[in-house]
Amino acid sequence: MSRVAKQPVPLPKGVEVHVADQRLVVKGPKGEMSVPFHPAVELRIDDGGASLTWSDNQNAQAGTMRAILNNMVQGVSQGYEQKLEIIGVGYRAQAKGKTLSLSLGFSHPVDYSVPDDITIETPTQTEIVIRGIDKQKIGQIAADIRAYRPPEPYKGKGVRYAGENVRRKEAKKK
């Protein structure tokens, strides 16, 4: 049996969970999310939270659905946030509405358009904060922005996640 799927997902106040037309729908104070729900897994709502039941050969699917449900509940109740740091001379970012403009040493600025349900802020020119309710979408946007100029191992310049350790290499010796 899946150890992940055995544990119930606690539901905070103001969060509703139900399955409609093979889709798992979660509503909360920060918004609403829905994802396709596997037909071999069943959802039960108790006073302690939401739990899953499944047939024996669907252990992996049940664990996946439980993790997705937990991420959705946390997203609509608290939200998610990902921070990026820009390191390098002349490297900077600026948020203008739903567009993020990045100067990363190219001959042109890189413009990244942000989806409607995600907000991007730049507290300083070298920090980017991505906020929203969908954990997967926030992670993908952060990875897309980082991919424009990933940190290089010799000087450490580039876009990195906050707190990311970049392994440095020694320069070539004569």
Swiss-Prot record:
> What is this protein's function?
This protein binds to the 23S rRNA, and is important in its secondary structure. It is located near the subunit interface in the base of the L7/L12 stalk, and near the tRNA binding site of the peptidyltransferase center.
- GO term, biological process aspect, one: cytoplasmic translation
Give coiled-coil spans as residue ranges.
none
- Please name the InterPro entries in this protein's record: Ribosomal_uL6-like, Ribosomal_uL6-like_a/b-dom_sf, Ribosomal_uL6_a/b-dom, Ribosomal_uL6_bac-type, Ribosomal_uL6_CS
Q: Which proteins does it associate with, and in what oligomeric form?
A: Part of the 50S ribosomal subunit.
Listed Pfam families = Ribosomal_L6
Keyword terms? Ribonucleoprotein, Ribosomal protein, RNA-binding, rRNA-binding
Q: Which family does it belong to?
A: Belongs to the universal ribosomal protein uL6 family.
- What is the protein name for this chain? Large ribosomal subunit protein uL6
Question: Per its record, what are the GO molecular function terms?
Answer: rRNA binding; structural constituent of ribosome
Q: Which GO terms describe its cellular component?
A: cytosolic large ribosomal subunit
